[in-house]
Design a protein with these regions (language model features):
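Catalytic machinery of carbohydrate-active enzymes
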Residues: 1-208
Length: 208
C-alpha cells in the first residue's frame, strides 16, 4: 500500500487551513495510508482521517529536539509522498519517493494562497475536517437547541496574526442582523486559557 506523510502545524488554526493541502495530497496518492505529524493541540482534528495509520504528536523541545525525535519516529518507514508544511529538512533524511516542502512566500501573502500554490492549484484549496461519532455527539451537545451558531476564534499565537476585535464585532453583528445569513444565530467566542485578554473584551463588545 502507498503511504503519505503529512507534516503540519502545532496550532489549531493553521492546522485547519492545512486540511485542504491534505485533501490535495490524497489525490496524488489515492488510497494511501496516512501518517500525520503535528502538535498536541492540533492532533484531535485529524483523528477521523480516512486511511489514517497514525498521528505522531510533536512536543516542542529545546534546540529543535522535536525534529530529531520526529525523524527517529519515522525512520523505520518509507513514503510515496511527503508533504512538509513546516519547511523542515526531515523528509530529506527519510526514504521518500517524492516530497513537497513549504517555503514561505512574500510577506503579507495569505496562507491559503501559499498552500494552493504549493499544491499546484490556481484556486484556494477547500478545507475539510472529517468527523467521528464522538465529535458529532460533542457538537450536538454544544449546540443544544440552537439551529445556527456563529463561532469566532479571535486569538492568535502572536500579535501580528490578530485582527482588531472591533472588526470581529462589526462582522459578527453584520452577519446576525435581521435579513442576514445568520440572523438570530448564537455567537460563541472561542479561544485558549491564555487568550482572555483578547476574548473577554470582544465578548463585551458583542453584548452592547
Amino acid at each position: 500500500m502507498a503511504r503519505l506523510l503529512f507534516i503540519t502545524s502545532n496550532r489549531i488554526g493553521d492546522a485547519v487551513l492545512s486540511t485542504g493541502a491534505l485533501e490535495a495530497a490524497r489525490a496524488l496518492v489515492p488510497g494511501a495510508g496516512v501518517t500525520i505529524a503535528c502538535g498536541p493541540l492540533a492532533a484531535p482534528l485529524f483523528r477521523a482521517e480516512p486511511s489514517l495509520e497514525r498521528i505522531v504528536v510533536m512536543e516542542k523541545d529545546k534546540l529543535a529536539g522535536h525534529w530529531v525525535a520526529l525523524w527517529r519516529d519515522l525512520i523505520g518507514h518509507s513514503y510515496d509522498l511527503a508533504i512538509d508544511l513546516r519547511g523542515s529538512a526531515t523528509s530529506y533524511f527519510l526514504p521518500v519517493k517524492k516530497r513537497i516542502v513549504f517555503r514561505s512566500g512574500k510577506a503579507g501573502g495569505h496562507k491559503l494562497d501559499e498552500l494552493a500554490a504549493l499544491m499546484g492549484s490556481d484556486a484556494p484549496l477547500e478545507m475539510k475536517i472529517h468527523l467521528d461519532p464522538r465529535a458529532r455527539r460533542d457538537a450536538k451537545a454544544f449546540a443544544g437547541a440552537d439551529k445556527k451558531l456563529l463561532l469566532i476564534g479571535a486569538g492568535a499565537n502572536w500579535i501580528g496574526k490578530t485582527w482588531p476585535r472591533e472588526n470581529f464585532a462589526a462582522l459578527a453583528k453584520r452577519l446576525t442582523k435581521p435579513g442576514a445569513p445568520l440572523t438570530d444565530a448564537r455567537i460563541v467566542v472561542l479561544g485558549g486559557p491564555d487568550e482572555g485578554g483578547v476574548l473577554d473584551p470582544l465578548a463585551e463588545d458583542l453584548q452592547k
